[in-house]
Amino acid sequence: MASVFVSATSVRADQATQRAMIAKWAGSYDTDTFLRQPMVRAELQKLLGSEMRHLMDNLNVRGGVDLSGETLSVNGNAPHQGTEEEAIVCVTVLPLKTIVEAAILSKGAVTVFAREEKYENASICLKDWITLVNSGHADRFTQPANVRVSSPVP
């Protein structure tokens, strides 16, 4: 019975840590410090190895830290190379673990860096970004043919 109590306490503490991390970073423009967080930086270095410099070059021009569900993300592009040299880092903050993934678009190909070995197990954060870069960001600015916009009748 004591171990169940300890586990429940641990989960509550982890959930509080999760909420604190999300509250601290969501919407922040201090992306350099976010990317240098020990759990983020260490995992990126393990996943990317010699490609770490390429990732950082492709994140040179970036916005703030985005939040979707439990995932914090930073994406950007190399200077003057949007749609050609881009990257993303996705950090999914779960109660018992934090999952770090990254992807680089370079020379028309997307390379995913993750512990998961199958694409279907990648986060929605990565998959949505891949869909966006594969469209050349067109779907952000031009209405797709199968999308209708409806407004209330006055």
Where are these regions (language model features)?
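Bacterial N-terminal signal peptides
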Residues: 1-5
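C-terminal partner/receptor-binding element of secreted or periplasmic proteins
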Residues: 15-29, 38, 108-154
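Short, solvent-exposed loop/hinge segments that bridge or flank secondary-structure elements
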Residues: 31-33
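Mature extracytoplasmic domains of secretory-pathway proteins
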Residues: 42-104
